[in-house]
Amino acid sequence: MLECKSRAWMEIDTTKIAHNVEEIRKLIPKKTKIMAIVKANAYGHGDVVISKELIKCGVDFFGVSSVDEAISLREAGITCDILILGYTPPMHFHYVLEHNLIQTFFSLEYAQKAAAFAQSQQTMMRGHVKIDTGMSRLGVICQDHEYHIDDVLRIYTMAGLQVEGIFSHFSVSDDLSKKNELYTKHQIILFDRVLADVKKAGIHPGVTHLQNSYGILNYPELAYDYVRPGLLFLGVTSNDALEIRTNPSFLPIMQLKANVSLVKTIQPNVSVSYGRNYCSKDVRKIATVSIGYADGYPRAVSNIGAEVLIHGQRATIIGNICMDQLMIDVTHIDQVKEGDVVTLIGEDQGAFLAVDELTRWAKTINNDTLCFFKGRVPRIYKSE
């Protein structure tokens, strides 16, 4: 891939990461550390580059979704602890051992398989126990309707396992409505109950962690050993319209750009793009932009009023977004020409178009939007 500004590209300013990490640290207790979640290629930003920058900021623990993501970091020379948050197929347990990774043990049965494999290799597998306090996804169920503390204790004492920590995950920490605030607080109570019962059994629980990004923003006073931010060190939240309890000042590190490939004038009653969903009412000047849904720009925002920036002004996307291209109306903007830069996320001559706007047009969350953008869009990093 061309490591340069091609037909479409991302510009990622890694110098802003240190500021964002410091904003996180201002929110949490001094003794609490950061486990940076860099899954999904660091939400599309580039996991290796972002992780190395975070290490410069004092981050010493990473979380990923899968064993292959963890191996990618190891092969790039990252030696910090790495927690695999998701499922590793038993046939791939050997990678966990070979690369000194930490596996999540999310059920008694799964932990038994991990322990059996480790014993067959005459070693121990490192891991953290996952507790289901209300997400009903992965984790040993420890809720009001079922409370399987015996399974948790058996995992801790299982031959072949080296359990180094325990964690759970909030499901609605982003929602401060009374109903969901009570739900989140009950998750905290359940997690603390598990910790107390583990200690009561004479077992040290190891490192503890519960807060995701919104757990940090809305419940910063919690004093577990680690917090698990993902989007925050990238300078964004899942939804900037949500009320939060704190007032951090994060700096978005990513911009999305593309080139104009052609400018043309069309007459009245001329259709644009597939499906003929847009038809001009009068003479219009349109520009074709060299980015499309194969690059990750969502087709769902076709012809609904979504905008981009060019020459510091907003231009509307017209017609259906194509696989490799989209069209914009630039009738009101002077001197648009081939090669001009279009900003789809970011800043242009003092104007700003946030990822949140694209997210709202696409009716999703920023986590999803940032993961849209595919590998064929080069990432251009600014590091000084």
List each language-model region with its residue ranges.
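Active-site-proximal beta-alpha core segment in soluble small-molecule metabolic enzymes
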Residues: 2-4, 8-11, 16-19, 26, ...
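Active-site anion/phosphate-binding pocket segments in diverse small-molecule metabolic enzymes
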Residues: 2-14, 18, 69, 88, ...
